[in-house]
């Protein structure tokens, strides 16, 4: 059997060359998008009088039959036909005969595959946004229940200041909100149609690219045919946005892993999202969180891979671009799976407020409160910082905490310190008083929750 492009060749490729050059193993995932693109293209060819009405009807009927078989997973593809485009054309030829050869009029596989990927990512991005929103709901629900749950806040992984657990959870809510905004904004650039650009220079046929774009639901058409077939910015942008999202999930998972350890005991991860050890009977491992953390690396790797592939390509199409798909497919699967796991894990997560609160009572995370206390009494902040630092040093030497010091010791360092200092140094006061906008104070966090609720009320795809 001759290749569909085989007219110029005297020799046929060997089986191992066919296997090396074929992409059907992975681009079969574009089967529905490819069929949709072909239907729009053929409809446009008919509208423009390039194909006869009966030819259009015959081809569309055949494509519809292939679509039904695709939905039923009944299509069989062959490596010999290289990719999804030529496999479908061969199957169409079997179904309706030689008229199938007219389907590819005024089209190249270059604009065809680009169209497929635009269609594919357009829907996958919407699905990712919906999954982000599901995780945001879980975070918001836990935050609403834990406004006055006090926990240590950290810098350098050292206890820094007590904060509200809700405040900590909402930090991730806002990270996800930015992720969602980036994905949403990227749809503007995914929503361009390359169909009709041909191999690189357009076509001599009187096609209507706006009509095929309209049929496919695209908002605009690439104005340059070279750019249309060689552009992979929209995939790179998706991979970049996905990498940032996975980085956020990885950071959160790192904290969940720490919090679930015996050293913290801030949370209990549900058995549903944990595994055991084949050797150590006592083990309960937060494997799902660890996997999400680990999978962030492969998504970032997919971005680096495509950036490296693209950096040396001259215009327009090059076979290298066949390598753009596997990383895209892998990233879609990884991101969607990670978001689903995270939402489920958060839904069944148990927090331990008593353990969190206790952790803030046996440390020096209230030292900033003492410095602020002295500053409010009229001492310049730098002097207050110095006095507080010397008091902390004294406590460390004496193996005491600030609230355990007698008032006489406090007043040795500053006569401004009075009995009311003990109330000011409680974790509750340390958190409650920080009501600047965006702060961890209970009132400020309640206002923040209201802002988050507004975001949730306008969720795009839920």
Swiss-Prot record:
EC class of the enzyme, as a word: lyase
Gene for this chain: argH
Subcellular location: Cytoplasm
Protein name per Swiss-Prot or TrEMBL: Argininosuccinate lyase
One Pfam family hit: ASL_C2
Family: Belongs to the lyase 1 family. Argininosuccinate lyase subfamily.
Catalytic activity: 2-(N(omega)-L-arginino)succinate = fumarate + L-arginine
UniProt keywords, alphabetically: Amino-acid biosynthesis, Arginine biosynthesis, Cytoplasm, Lyase
GO cellular component: cytosol
Main location: cytoplasm
BP term (GO), one: arginine biosynthetic process via ornithine
EC number annotated for this UniProt entry: 4.3.2.1
Organism: Exiguobacterium sp. (strain ATCC BAA-1283 / AT1b)
A GO term, aspect molecular function: argininosuccinate lyase activity
Pathways involved: Amino-acid biosynthesis; L-arginine biosynthesis; L-arginine from L-ornithine and carbamoyl phosphate: step 3/3
NCBIfam families reported for this sequence: argH
Source organism, top-level taxon: Bacteria
């Amino acid at each position: 059997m001759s290749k569909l492009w085989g007219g110029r060749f005297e020799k046929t490729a060997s089986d191992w060359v066919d296997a090396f050059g074929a992409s059907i193993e992975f681009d079969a995932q574009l089967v529905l998008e490819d069929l949709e693109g072909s239907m729009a293209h053929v409809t446009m060819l008919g509208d423009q009088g390039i194909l006869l009405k009966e030819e259009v009807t015959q081809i569309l009927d055949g494509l519809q039959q292939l679509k039904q078989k695709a939905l039923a997973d009944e299509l069989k593809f062959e490596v010999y036909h290289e990719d999804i485009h030529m496999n479908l054309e061969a199957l169409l030829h079997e179904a309706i005969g030689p008229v199938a050869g007219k389907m590819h009029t005024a089209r190249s596989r270059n604009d065809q595959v680009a169209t497929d990927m635009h269609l594919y990512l357009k829907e996958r991005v919407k699905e990712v946004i919906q999954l982000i929103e599901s995780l945001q709901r879980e975070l918001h629900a836990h935050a609403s229940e834990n406004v006055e749950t006090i926990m240590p806040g950290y810098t350098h992984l050292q206890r820094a200041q007590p904060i509200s657990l809700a405040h900590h959870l909402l930090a991730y809510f806002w990270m996800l909100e930015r992720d969602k905004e980036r994905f949403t904004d990227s749809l503007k650039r995914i929503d361009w149609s390359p169909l009709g650009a041909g191999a690189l220079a357009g076509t001599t046929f009187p096609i209507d690219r706006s009509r095929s774009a309209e049929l496919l639901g695209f908002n605009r058409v690439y104005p340059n045919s070279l750019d249309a077939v060689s552009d992979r910015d929209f995939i790179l942008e998706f991979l970049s946005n996905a990498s940032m999202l996975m980085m956020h999930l990885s950071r959160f998972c790192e904290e969940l892993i720490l919090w679930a350890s015996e050293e913290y005991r801030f949370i209990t991860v549900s058995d549903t999202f944990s595994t055991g050890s084949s050797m150590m009977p006592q083990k309960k491992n937060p494997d799902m969180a660890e996997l999400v953390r680990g999978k962030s690396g492969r998504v970032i790797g997919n971005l680096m891979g495509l950036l490296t592939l693209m950096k040396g390509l001259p215009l327009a199409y090059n076979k290298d671009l066949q390598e753009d798909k596997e990383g895209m497919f892998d990233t879609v699967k990884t991101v969607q799976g990670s978001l689903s796991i995270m939402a489920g894990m958060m839904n069944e997560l148990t927090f331990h407020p008593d353990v969190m609160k206790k952790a803030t009572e046996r440390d020096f995370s209230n030292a900033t409160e003492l410095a602020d206390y002295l500053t409010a009494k009229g001492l310049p902040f730098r002097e207050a910082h110095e006095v507080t630092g010397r008091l902390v040093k004294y406590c460390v030497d004496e193996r005491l905490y600030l609230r355990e010091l007698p008032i006489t010791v406090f007043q040795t360092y500053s006569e401004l310190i009075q009995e009311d200092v003990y109330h000011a140094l409680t974790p509750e006061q340390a958190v409650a008083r920080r009501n600047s906008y965006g702060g961890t104070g209970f009132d400020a966090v309640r206002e923040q929750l209201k802002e988050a609720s507004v975001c949730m009320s306008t969720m795009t795809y839920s």
